[in-house]
Curated annotation (Swiss-Prot):
Record protein name field: Light-harvesting protein B800/850/890 alpha-1 chain
Gene Ontology terms: biological process: photosynthesis, light reaction
UniProt-annotated binding residues for a bacteriochlorophyll: 29
Subcellular compartments: Cell inner membrane
Organism this protein belongs to: Halorhodospira halophila (strain DSM 244 / SL1)
């Protein structure tokens, strides 16, 4: 495992992982907001 961190800078790897997870979370939330069932902002009142 230590050889992997000699190839890649751990700071850049962590920034990349967190950036990817943030983009993925935004995409999932916008997909849910585009549906009628899971739109918690402007959905139909039940």
């Amino acid at each position: 495992m230590w050889r992997l961190w000699k190839l890649y800078d751990p700071r850049r790897v962590l920034i990349g992982i967190f950036s990817w997870l943030a983009v993925l979370a935004l995409v999932i939330h916008f997909i849910l907001l585009s549906t009628d069932r899971f739109n918690w902002v402007g959905g139909a009142a039940n």
